[in-house]
Swiss-Prot record:
Source organism (scientific name): Staphylococcus haemolyticus (strain JCSC1435)
Assembly behavior: Homodimer.
Cofactor: FAD
EC number, as in UniProt: 1.18.1.2
Catalyzed reactions per annotation: 2 reduced [2Fe-2S]-[ferredoxin] + NADP(+) + H(+) = 2 oxidized [2Fe-2S]-[ferredoxin] + NADPH
Name this polypeptide is given: Ferredoxin--NADP reductase
Gene3D superfamilies the record matches: FAD/NAD(P)-binding domain (3.50.50.60)
Family statement: Belongs to the ferredoxin--NADP reductase type 2 family.
InterPro entries listed in its UniProt record: FAD/NAD-bd_sf, FAD/NAD-binding_dom, Fd--NADP_Rdtase_type_2, Ferredoxin-NADP_redctase_2
HAMAP family: FENR2
Length: 343
């Protein structure tokens, strides 16, 4: 039996893993995705500015640092597993069941699933999925992949606009299509895109994807003007779709241990990561309380609280907080390696 099962491998879950290890607890992380990092994996090229004391850097670089830190104390990690139930058997005895049929036991549970299971909304046209492994994209993993190419972006939200801006000086051409006549609230961004020579096509949607002879790659796209019905055909090297995300969090509704909810997707918290069930703690975007700030930085604070409270739940005689890292002997050997990098 582990001391703590952490459900979710994003910023909150990874720092909870680190801090629980710092407090001497054994940890298991379970995540439905095939890699750690949570929602941040959707925006790997985005520059993150708002983590205190961390210089602006691409999201994927921050993910690497968070994963290295989260795995420092060697937690068990189970990826590609969806948690389907949490059962409190007794005080300091929980069962966490996954869709693999496995049941993992622990003395406490930390809920750190962010916004839940997030999947990009697929392009709703015939045979679109056949191109997903080639040149139909729902996530921009690397800007360099699109260098010198003719790109079509479909979507009118901030992500689509950001991708159009960021790729404008990398790609050969950018065409942005969106269903509305204008994009309210983004007037300044539209001006930027025009200055970057992005081809803006309002009231336009993708009607058909035309593949090559082997139907492995998109070669042309039929675009339809929603207002006039006019259809034009243009050649593109890649198509990027940004139509938002589907959020799933069936665990909150279906699990045996019923957590009080703020809405359908978030746990009602009390400001210190405790929930209505002793032994289950919630941190990061999944928890809501009146003082909540939805930032990566605040997820770290939540995670530290959750780990500390899990420690005292398991062992009421334990110190309420751990020693700070600068004075903690647990890092004695690791510090030598770090110091050598600066000599």
């Amino acid at each position: 039996m582990q001391d703590v099962t952490i459900i979710g491998g994003g910023p909150a879950g990874l720092f909870a893993s680190f801090y629980a290890g710092l407090r001497g607890m054994s940890v298991r992380i379970i995540d439905v995705q095939d890699k750690l990092g949570g929602k941040m994996q959707i925006y790997p090229e985005k520059i993150i500015w708002d983590i205190g004391g961390v210089a602006p850097k691409p999201c994927n670089e921050i993910i690497k640092d968070m994963i290295n830190q989260g795995l420092h104390f060697n937690p068990k990690v189970n990826l590609n597993e969806r948690v389907t139930d949490i059962r409190k058997i007794a005080e300091r005895h929980f069962e966490v069941e996954t869709d693999s049929g496995q049941i993992y036991e622990s003395k406490a549970v930390i809920f750190a699933v962010g916004g839940g299971i997030i999947n990009p909304k697929p392009l709703q046209i015939k045979d679109a999925e056949r191109y997903r492994l080639t040149n139909l994209h729902y996530v921009v993993q690397s800007f360099s992949k699109f260098k010198g190419k003719d790109i079509l972006i479909s979507g009118g939200g901030n992500t689509a606009l950001d991708w159009a801006r960021d790729l404008a000086n990398i790609a050969n051409s950018i065409t942005l299509v969106y269903r509305k006549s204008d994009i309210k609230g983004y007037e300044a961004m539209i001006s930027v895109l025009k200055a970057l020579n992005v081809n803006l096509l309002p009231k336009t949607q993708i009607k058909e994807l035309i593949g090559d002879n082997k139907c492995e790659c998109i070669k042309e796209v039929k675009l339809e003007n929603i207002e006039t019905g006019e259809v034009t055909t243009q050649a593109f090297d890649d198509v990027i779709v940004s139509h938002g995300f589907d959020h799933e969090n069936p665990l909150l509704k279906d699990c045996t241990s019923k957590l009080d909810l703020y809405d359908e997707y978030r746990v009602k918290g009390f400001g210190n990561t405790t929930t209505n069930i002793p032994g289950i703690f919630a941190c990061g975007d999944i928890v809501h309380h009146d003082a909540k700030v939805h930032l990566i930085a605040s997820a770290f604070s939540d995670a530290g609280n959750a780990a500390n409270l899990a420690k005292t739940y398991i062992n009421p005689d334990a110190y309420k907080e751990g020693y700070v890292s600068s004075h903690n002997d647990v890092f004695k050997e690791s510090n030598k390696k770090v110091i050598n990098q600066y000599i």
